[in-house]
From Swiss-Prot:
Superkingdom to which the source organism belongs: Bacteria
Chain positions recorded as NADPH binding sites: S82, K83, R260, G261
PANTHER family in the record: NADPH-DEPENDENT 7-CYANO-7-DEAZAGUANINE REDUCTASE
Entry annotation: catalytic residues: C191, D198
Designated name of the protein: NADPH-dependent 7-cyano-7-deazaguanine reductase
Biological pathway: tRNA modification; tRNA-queuosine biosynthesis
Example of a GO biological process term: queuosine biosynthetic process
Record's keyword terms, sorted: Cytoplasm, NADP, Oxidoreductase, Queuosine biosynthesis
A Pfam family recorded for this sequence: QueF
Binding site for substrate: V80, E81, S82, H231, E232
Catalyzed reactions: 7-aminomethyl-7-carbaguanine + 2 NADP(+) = 7-cyano-7-deazaguanine + 2 NADPH + 3 H(+)
Length: 285
């Protein structure tokens, strides 16, 4: 099945009636075959989708609005193509529902069927101050200035380059594993369907006997700038590369991508489910 499918190849018709058939699944195996690593180690975590343009009608025909968060397990065989999700949510705009809970149940059923796994759906009232959708800050230090003192120009690369992680480093190891927590706001890749740029913030927490070189890590993150890959695939590529180079005892990799079409996507992969953080939202979302 082509990742383009019927999306992006012709003028889009926006449905005005409930249309679950617009949801378009994409096999995770497509991206994982490219990574060429152990699939089972990429299946621990979640993809959190946050939708800010959800609306439906109550029984009086009055528009209702809410913010939604969808939790798709990394073990699901499929992801959902983001534009198809937007079309699906739009199709609910003029459908009557008796309660918010009914909408929540319906969306969970349709998304679960699409990705062939149980999807957790939360709907938040706009007046709920404790929704977990307030602006947060990544943990750790920001490494975006790690190359500020370097005179070397960072070249553009067509594909991610994990060899940058070991550039000009020694084989010295730390006697006891140390935890490094850091983030960068400079993650960029391209959507493989539309070729549009996807910007995001990447955060990593890693416990390893190998020290993290912030400058090399930044070079590695910048090597994604012209890479064509879905959000989930990019995070899994980073998780696989860091796992193979650092051989960590614990690893968490997550990204918060900026919103498009009212939806942002936030994948997270962990070496153990106990390391899974809570979903959150950053300032660019």
């Amino acid at each position: 099945m082509s990742i383009h499918g019927i999306l992006g190849e012709q003028t889009t018709d926006y449905p005005t009636e409930y249309s679950p058939e617009t949801l378009y699944p994409i096999a995770r195996s497509m991206g994982r075959e490219v990574i060429g690593w152990q699939d089972d180690k990429l299946e621990v975590g979640f993809d959190w989708w946050q939708a800010f343009e959800l609306s439906w009608l109550n029984e009086q025909g009055i528009s209702q609005v809410a913010i939604a968060r969808f939790g798709i397990p990394a073990s699901s065989p499929f992801i959902v193509e983001s534009k198809s999700l937007k079309l699906y949510l739009n199709s609910i705009n003029f459908t009557e529902f008796g309660s918010l809970e009914t909408v929540q149940t319906l969306i969970a059923k349709d998304l679960s069927k699409c990705v062939q796994a149980e999807v957790n759906v939360e709907l938040f009232d706009l007046e709920d101050e404790h929704s977990g959708l307030l602006i947060a800050q990544p943990d750790g230090i920001c490494i975006d200035d790690a190359l500020a003192d370097s005179t070397e120009k960072v070249a553009l690369t067509l594909h991610p380059d994990a060899s940058l992680l070991e550039r000009n480093t020694s084989d010295a190891k730390i006697s006891e594993g140390k935890t490094f927590s850091f983030y960068s706001n400079l993650l960029r890749s391209n959507c493989p369907v539309t070729n549009q740029p996807d910007w995001g913030t990447l955060a990593v927490s890693i416990t390893s006997n190998k020290p993290v070189n912030n400058a090399n890590m930044l070079r590695y993150i910048l090597s994604f700038r012209q890479h064509n890959g879905f959000h989930e695939q990019c995070v899994e590529q980073i998780f696989a590369d860091l796992s193979q180079y650092y051989e960590p005892s614990e690893l968490m990799v997550r990204a918060w991508y900026t919103r498009r079409g009212g939806i942002d996507i936030n994948p997270c992969r962990v070496s153990d489910i106990a390391l899974l953080p809570v979903p959150s939202r950053l300032i660019r979302q």
